[in-house]
Structures are given as C-alpha cells and as structure tokens.
Amino acid sequence: MTIGNFRPATVLIDETAILHNIQHEVARLKKQTQLFAVVKADAYGHGMLRVARVAKAAGATGFCVAILDEALGLRKADYSEPVLVLGIVPSQYAAIAAAQTISLPVSSTEWLEQALPVLEAQPELPPLRIHLALDTGMGRIGFTEDQALKTAVAFVEAHPKQFVIEGVFTHFATADAPDDTYFKQQVDKFNHLVNLLPSRPRYVHVSNSATSLWHAACNGNMIRYGVAIYGLNPSGDAIPTTPFPLEPALSLKSELTYCKQVHAGDGISYGVTYRAKGDEFIGTVPIGYADGWLRRLQGFHVLVDGQYCEIVGRICMDQFMIRLPKAYPAGTKVVLVGQSGDQEITLLDVAKYSKTIHYEIACNLTPRLKRQSVNPVD
C-alpha cells in the first residue's frame, strides 16, 4: 500500500513513552527474568523496526513475532537477539528458521516428523530451536495431553542434530480479568505438564503483559511483553490500576482540508444519514476507513482547537466530515487520537465506541497513514 506522504494525516509514535513502558517493567522483574518485546503486526501498528530499536535500548533481550516473515525482517535489519515466532510455521520452512537461528513453536509430534526430512536435507544447519507450546486452557495451539507431550520430547531427543528444546510456554486466556479462577487452573495445568519434561529448557515463559503486570509471581525466566509496551492497559479498564503509569505511545492527527457552511436539511455523506439541523459549519478530514478509521465511528468525535467535534454522516473510504462550532480554515489541526488543549481522546475511547478493543484499533491503522517518531530515543 502506498504511504500518504503528501497528505496531512500522520500516526505519531512517542519513542520516549515506549522506553518508559519497557524500562519500568524491566526494573520490576527478578534478576533472572528476561523481557522479550512483542513486535508482531508491525509492533501493533507502531512500526516493528522503530519499536525494536527502542526496546533494545530499554533493556529487552529478545523479540517475539507472530509469523516467520516478521522474524526474517528483524534478521534482515541486523537484529541478532533471540527471536521467537509465536504462531505455527508450516514445517517446510523449518530450515529457513534454523539457518537464521529463529525459534519456532511446536504443538505436535506430527509437525516434528514433517520437519525432520527438511532439516536432514541440510545437515550443515544448526539444530532448529523449538519452544514446546502447552495448551492449558487458551484452546489455540499446544499440547494438552501428557502422553502427546512425552512422545514429542522423545522424538526431539532422538534427533539432536535437527532439534533442540529451547523453551516451553503457555498463554493465559484471562490474565487481564479481575476473576483469577480460570487463570489459576491454567497455572496448575502448566506446572503439571512442565514437570513431565526430563529437564527445564533455557526459557520457561507464561507471561504476556497482563500476567507480568498483575501476576508477576507466575513469571518464569522470560516474559513476552506486548501491548503494555505501547502504553495500553491490557484489560482496557477492567483492571484500571497498573504497577506504574503506562504512557500511550500513539496519536493520530490530521488537518481540515475543507470547511463550508450548510443549512437546515442539507445532507452529509453517503445515504444522507445526517442532515443539518440549522446553519452549521462542516469540516472535511482526509482520513477514512481505508486508513483503518472504522465506518462505525459515525457519531463519535475528534478534537479541533481543544473542542469535541462530532463525526457526521457516514465515514467514507478516504474522508469524513465533522460538525464544527465555527468556521475554521483549511489546515486547522484535527486530533483523532491524542490531546488538544485540555481534552484527550484515547485509543480506548475509540475502541469502546467501536465495540472492540484498543489493540484492534491500533493494528487497523493501515500503512497508508505515514508514521513519524516524536521524542526520539538514540
């Protein structure tokens, strides 16, 4: 997708906020516990390489991504730190990961059996580093049964030139919820399955941001620190208090491209779902649903000159309209996410109106919106 460099619409990334959010968590960790920065999905829309650079400066010792392509992107950018792919990678690509010392998750002996000939075909490669995924209640990937796990471990031990168990992990489904009943059940199952291993691997990890923030006693010797890097509370506002203040890193700003006066009954946008109630000033903002500004945000608001201005009419692919308190010239600043005067719109505000989570809003902001760092970290 083409980046809109010649359009007044910018995602601003505060690098100092990212540094703060990581450094404060690193300071809370036990000495033996490492922090891997989760930079999947282009670092939740913040820019993978930008965040990786700041995370490394802040004390992160490794990275987690979702797909092999993201891991290769880090290697191409000369990041030599450990990189763990969190999603299942097709077995035919096992040799690519091994060649780049990229760690992969394993959820079945079948995957190991399929990857074996791929790795045997290139005997010069180092053993593939694998992390055994344990499904303790997330229901996504991982071993659930004792015997299945034992069989996989035995297979790995029988092929030491092709595989090495570097880690074991699980993922909690409710770490961000006030009720920890299910969370504790998952902890118990994880401990049971880990105790089946002949020895503990280098990395034993269970903690995402929510787990590390609110259940730090469960941290193994590595945490997968994700959404909190970006200053977003993993729970939304279900658990409003965090051990230290999280600083939001992302803001979204634009400008008016056009302003006009309309009169009572005049229609705005597709379907004419909004008609002016009287003489009104309508401004046009050059962002639309093709940029990830969701169509269902009609009726929400943005900030102009420190004032809330309602989004009127349907949001178009590339533009939307707002009702202004007075006439403003083209070029007037518009804040979609962030501060203007004494007012602020957060990603969580946008998410609540959209009936979703702030993770999704951040990830939905498309590459067409140019990204720009503020408060850069050397």
UniProtKB/Swiss-Prot annotation:
GO terms for biological process: D-alanine biosynthetic process; peptidoglycan biosynthetic process. Catalyzes the interconversion of L-alanine and D-alanine. May also act on other amino acids. InterPro entries: Ala_racemase, Ala_racemase/Decarboxylase_C, Ala_racemase_C, Ala_racemase_N, Ala_racemase_pyridoxalP-BS, PLP-binding_barrel. Belongs to the alanine racemase family. This is Alanine racemase. GO terms for molecular function: alanine racemase activity; pyridoxal phosphate binding. It catalyses: L-alanine = D-alanine. Substrate binds at residues 140, 317. The gene is alr. Keywords: Isomerase, Pyridoxal phosphate. The active site is at 40 (proton acceptor), 270 (proton acceptor). Pfam families: Ala_racemase_C (PF00842), Ala_racemase_N (PF01168). Its EC number is 5.1.1.1. Pathway: Amino-acid biosynthesis; D-alanine biosynthesis; D-alanine from L-alanine: step 1/1. Its cofactor is pyridoxal 5'-phosphate. The modification N6-(pyridoxal phosphate)lysine is found at residue 40. The keyword Isomerase applies. One of its GO terms (cellular component) is cytosol.
